[in-house]
């Protein structure tokens, strides 16, 4: 039986939302559709950085995960979205230098275990966004009924970062490439530009090193469950070719590239400026095809 800390009745919406702490590091919101017995449950895994359960960061509010949760509920699908453990690190005196990529996988495994112990949900699906895609792949190997990659990279993070930087500066891109090589060989690096401090500062290097050792294409190939791979054609952070790499590696996958969808699931009809502005526009609707694609896949799982 689930322990609900708080119950909020949605008077105008066909769902209820409950605040559910899984453990001392994981707080989240369980969204349950009304009048649906044993609905499927989607666990939404956030992307990189200090991202909260709704898909927001400081000075960047778009409510991407919140919107997905609510619209899935309108289609009879439950979901659990949660704050990353980053928000609890200060409280429990966890240092940045002690954080590893595997910690986030452990968190998702804890959530899986928590909800697998409940009998209110017919299926449990992991859906990971961006960095959360790889986290979800690794956690799904421990038990899930299906997996959804939302704008998930198909290559290791060092290759993604080097490619992203090349769009801004070839010099910085090459500097990052060399720093990653040194970090991989020796465990750390000091030969990086001050402009790359956010990626290579000493306290974050152990995390980056633990992350870059995973090749998403190799990890998704280990899954024998149904897989949905979604990317947008206007994603400036993760190119649709990454989705194609994942699809080629997966044994049982469906690939969907949504036209003009950006990294946070919005339809962009203008240029790059509109794309960037969308990251801080919570009232901008989700891409119109996203929820139908998700719903069709989830309801097709046997």
Pin down the residues of each PLM region.
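Short alpha-helix in the alpha/beta-hydrolase fold that links the catalytic acid
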Residues: 225, 238-249
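Conserved alpha/beta-hydrolase
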Residues: 65-91
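Alpha/beta-hydrolase active-site loop
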Residues: 96-118
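Short, surface-exposed "cap/lid" segments of acyl-processing enzymes
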Residues: 36-38, 42-72
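Accessory cap/linker subdomain of secreted extracellular hydrolases
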Residues: 146-218
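N-terminal cap/lid segment of alpha/beta-hydrolase-fold proteins
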Residues: 11-37
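Catalytic active-site module of serine/aspartate enzymes centered on a nucleophile-bearing elbow/loop
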Residues: 264, 270-302
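Short beta-strand/loop motif that positions the catalytic acidic residue
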Residues: 223, 229-231
